Amino acid sequence: MSASTTKTRTYAADDSAFPNAQIGYAPLVDTTEAGDATLRYLELTWREAEPEEGVYAWEAISEKYGFASLREQGIHLVIRFVCDVPGQETHLDIPDWLYAQTKDGSWYDTDYGKGYSPNYANVVFRAAHHRVLYALAEFLGTDGFVSYVELGSLGHWGEWHIKSEDGLVPMPDETIRDEYAADYLAAFPTAELLMRRPFRFAAEQSLGLYNDMTGEEKDTDEWLGWIAEGGWYGSDPNALTPMPDFWQNAPVGGEFTSSLSMQDMLVKNLPRTLHLLEISHMSFLGPKTAQVKYAKGYNAVLRRLGYRLRVTELKLNLCTDGVSAELTVANEGAAPFYWDWPTNLYVEDTAGSTLCTVRLPLSLPELMPGKSQKVSVTLEGADAQELLCGGWKGLFRSPKHLTIGIVDPMTSRDAVRFAMKAARKNGRTVLL
């Protein structure tokens, strides 16, 4: 078998739609129709989390939503902790014991629905919230299971908005709102945090943002306007801060609006929907996701969520102690990959056993859409040199293969699919 001293290969883009790690659809955690989505969405009420003061229902919650199974499958969570979800019946979303200690919120029956809006400025409420949030974070852990945390806690649906024009106790002032946000920042150091609006805190702390009116042009344009120019919130004309380039460092999430039909968003006005997604640089949508029965729209939306990584070129050169490898990696998606997960090259034998692993000096969070990075490493040893055996026409006879993978630290498995036309095996993409 002959050996050459150099080898170059290029790879075409795979333009198909597919789920991928940390991006795409985030259906409800207890749905039976999640398909192959890599994310799940958990809306957790305080009432469910802490039924008695200081007594947390973590074991029941973990079992109810199958957390152990999700972790094993490599599925990650989007979580929103909420205190007020408008419904069809009068109800409480905070625990009875907490209501008994406060009672200074507002029972309501509005066009949003029925429920109870707490007084979030209440000192007892704030102290109890601090405790439950840290307990929740400790329960969920720091293994990366929770990828995204949407703030959460304040307002109807946790969206930091109260229908105070209907006489409800209004949102607290910025100082108190910032206390809530600071608790989230401290409690969830390994997750990406997202706020509903570009508050000053979000801009200063480089947080992400989410849009729960995705697909609705007027509301999304207003949301994008806040991001571009800042604006009013309540009585403060400067509470919303311009942060037009935030998506380069922090993610965009949200869900489809309930004000439009799937037929409208995924068929009739699909181009409009896709345009709104693209200019928003979204990474995930949930829990209201596209319906799979609208296959064209479902896939078109999925394809526009998040990063799309491709090795565009590989160059191998024989060197004294092995093979030098130079790769050009491009991001052809709408957003960066926000986690610094290890990107590895692997030399494998024909049975798929890993003979050599080398981490690439590739910074995924810095790889912006439309950009590429060129990285070089040395694959040491005779096994790597055998990658240059044969010739392009005789590659099938080469005793070694070169693969690339991006490892999810939660599972220690390769989890990211590259958007390129190449064979895949065990979560890795085959380069040679």
Question: What residues fall within each predicted segment?
Answer:
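N-terminal substrate-binding region of glycoside hydrolase catalytic domains
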Residues: 2-121, 241-293
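Short catalytic/ligand-binding loop motif for oxyanion handling, primarily in non-cytosolic enzymes
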Residues: 48-50, 85-94, 155-161, 201-205, ...
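Short, flexible/disordered intra-domain loops and linkers
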Residues: 52-54, 160-172
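An active-site-proximal structural segment forming one wall of the substrate-binding cleft
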Residues: 65-71, 100-150, 176-183
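Acidic, His- and aromatic-enriched active-site or binding-groove loops in soluble protein domains
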Residues: 105-110, 167-194, 210-231
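Aromatic-lined carbohydrate-recognition surfaces of secreted/lumenal glycan-active proteins
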Residues: 145-156, 177-205
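Substrate-binding cleft of secreted/luminal carbohydrate-active enzymes
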Residues: 198-202, 209-312
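Extracellular/luminal regions of secreted and cell-surface proteins that mediate adhesion/ECM remodeling
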Residues: 303-432
